[in-house]
Amino acid sequence: MKRLSFFLFLCFAVSTNAQSIYRTACQGNIERLDSLLVSTDINTQDQRGRTLLHWAVGCTKKAMFEHLIEKGIQIDVPDNEGATPLYMAVRFQNLELFDRLVDLLPNTDWKMNSGGKLFEKAILNRDLSFVQKLTELGVPLDVTTTKGSTPLEIALRIQADSISNWLEAHGANKNLIRLVEAKGPYLGQQPPQLEAKLFAPNFISTEEYEFGSVFNTAGDEFFYGVDLGGRNVIRYSKLSKGVWSKPETILSHEKYGYNDPFLSPDENRLYFISNQALDGLGDPKDIDIWYVERQGEGWSAPINAGPNINSKSEEYYISFTEEGTMYFASDKNQNHHDIYYSKYKGGRFMEAVKLGPAINTEAYEADVYVDPKETYLIFCAQREGGLGRGDLYISFKDKEGNWTPSVNMGDNVNTQGHELCPFVTADGKYLFYTSRQDIYWISTTVFESLRP
């Protein structure tokens, strides 16, 4: 599952795949809900750990919210990512339901247990009123997040000036702000083994939603996507004289989103996906694959990858073999995404070919990374028996040149959440991917136990 047009689903909009009882809560149909509760526990949780109360808050259904409270639903259950209904009220900027939940909570432990996470979301929303509300309720101004960031540090990092000014004026401790630098190979991070590690915390992996990362072959350029409240941008950091530059945004637009960066084999093009109109002026359209070309120290205007790649449906994620064959995902002529490849000949891409049943199923397959030598590929899929909402799977080429049946990469990589956006470094040593809205990495020795 991706961002852009799918972002609203990830943030609680109703999906056709949502189970009936959760869809009913989101629609606010109390009569229908009661009929379903005859055979379902009121504290049921969906695949992401969300309760009916999460859905009522996320879909802003006050009457449904009150009905669930009256029927005795638990009010402080966290989902798989630790988000409670109280957090959802902050996320969706619903002050009325937030106040109601605060009144219902049995004690004030939430101020220390969840205060950092609530401040974080309020600041990412650039919602000064919620920052003020949390302060009025007694949440400490210098409470920290799981990454050790104070509200003031977060506000300064994302340049939420009105919030940082207000926090400073009300006594936030400036001495707690950390200045994070990155030096040397892999941004100075200690390489992981068989346990995935958060990559470059508080420099790359911050309180924002980062995903879709790629290094160049030399390892001195790093590109990645960031979700800014539903609008996606691509950021860039460069190693110079041993120090990595502060990440800067190189592709953004007030109307369109850009994400899933990937370099062409010669590294003169940066490919990505976008909902940009073909003329660069109209309303956002379906998601296509685009690229920009290097021009000195900058980049050209976005160029559409053309009709042999793109369709009237949506195309996602890009990776390349050494010969320039592009692997990507598309949902053209179908109701779910599958993985395709397109050979590059004579300066253009050939008609795309869908991979066979060893890779594609009736489920969702996307976010494909192909080894440059085409010996294995890794992709995201949503399949029965998976560990979470979306898992990474791997397939290897056999001696006859066929893809082996893909297998789940297991709990060294996958979690109860959503794993996506795989990339393997040019030295073949590390797998990068997105998990829990951050970028993680792990040693590729994890592949060995997965080979057929």
Residue ranges and their predicted role:
Residues 1-21:
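Bacterial Sec-dependent N-terminal signal peptides
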Residues 19-21, 45-52, 78-84, 111-120, ...:
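Ankyrin-repeat boundary/"N-cap" motif
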Residues 19-38, 47-50, 58, 66, ...:
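Intrinsically disordered, low-complexity regulatory segments in ankyrin-centric signaling systems
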Residues 20-23, 104, 157, 161-179:
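Ankyrin-repeat-protein effector appendages
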Residues 23-28, 55-61, 88-94, 121-127, ...:
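Ankyrin repeat A-helix N-terminal signature
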